[in-house]
């Protein structure tokens, strides 16, 4: 933290119209900071009923900001979001991968475009309603730690943040659990106290995903096969399926198979537009022993090349897995202590040392005993 008093410290809060960012602004205001609220409009968003949800959310931001007595603004990042997040999102699906737009949205919008805008407003820091914590050493190095609420910890989605971004960031909810945040909002009578949490893609909301994706990418139906060549039917388009997916295959326990075990997606072949499926949650082709990832980013300074035993998550809310990482510039090979199920290219692999999030990378390919998985 700077040597300034709270009253001399300007904090620009990213306010979404939800309860978390509302309480973030409230707590900072109560702590005496010079708080400004900013609503980011990143998507031209109309829901299934024709209601522009961004307009409704902005009204909630205005109501809360008025209640707690802070100025507020709206800023339009639709172009930045389209260029830096949505184009990436579509390119990943075209390549048969399953992207994580929330990771990219934090990296490119909330902690880049928004951070730059906040600095123009004279900010010393930005703050968001993420469940994560920061700790600063005497030498100024910032460590990003998991949020106190294990169910809500969001360091997975913040794993691409750099040291420079973290030095300018505050996470006032990091030490709180979600029920306590709700209680604070209710006690203060905030307009958003009872508003339900948003789900769905970062800034795109709760649209019908298949229909939404189909508006931007033409679907290419193809064959659904087992790994030993038995045709099981047709798929609607490889982009609609992810490794380990069970629902939406429409094959049940059919085709004269010996068991009634459910079917899962075990691979995709873009060259032949084939979706591979296998029977059983523990199908051997769902398990990998290592992966390669790129776009590696650490939350603090690290050597150019090194090996480290630590833990990792391969998806949000997953238990940590012991791994050994082999780092070379912005690429990393990750060897697992135990085989891991349903490693998904396009998703983030995020590294931890105890409570500290060290950073992460985007998964390119998984292997089983050096044999490439998922992409035949």
From Swiss-Prot:
Family, per entry: Belongs to the MnmA/TRMU family.
EC code(s) of this entry: 2.8.1.13
Keywords (A to Z) from UniProt: ATP-binding, Cytoplasm, Disulfide bond, Nucleotide-binding, RNA-binding, Transferase, tRNA processing, tRNA-binding
Disulfide bonds: 105-202
Marked site (Interaction with tRNA) residue numbers: 130, 347
CC terms in the record's Gene Ontology section: cytoplasm
GO biological process: tRNA wobble position uridine thiolation
Record field: catalytic activity: S-sulfanyl-L-cysteinyl-[protein] + uridine(34) in tRNA + AH2 + ATP = 2-thiouridine(34) in tRNA + L-cysteinyl-[protein] + A + AMP + diphosphate + H(+)
Organism encoding this protein: Lactococcus lactis subsp. cremoris (strain SK11)
CDD domains attached to this UniProt entry: MnmA_TRMU-like
Name of the gene encoding the protein in the UniProt record: mnmA
Chief location of this protein within or outside the cell: cytoplasm
GO molecular function terms attached to this record: ATP binding; tRNA binding; tRNA-uridine 2-sulfurtransferase activity
Domain of life of the organism encoding this protein: Bacteria
InterPro entries given in the database record: MnmA-like, MnmA-like_C, MnmA-like_central, MnmA-like_central_sf, Rossmann-like_a/b/a_fold
Residues involved in ATP binding: 14-21, 40, 129
Keyword Repeat: no
Interaction with target base in tRNA: annotated span: 100-102
Name of the protein this chain belongs to: tRNA-specific 2-thiouridylase MnmA
Record-annotated active site: 105, 202
Xref: Pfam families: tRNA_Me_trans, tRNA_Me_trans_C, tRNA_Me_trans_M
Keyword flag Transit peptide: no
Known function: Catalyzes the 2-thiolation of uridine at the wobble position (U34) of tRNA, leading to the formation of s(2)U34.
TM segment ranges: none
Compartment list: Cytoplasm
Enzyme class: transferase
Region (Interaction with tRNA), start-end ranges: 152-154, 315-316
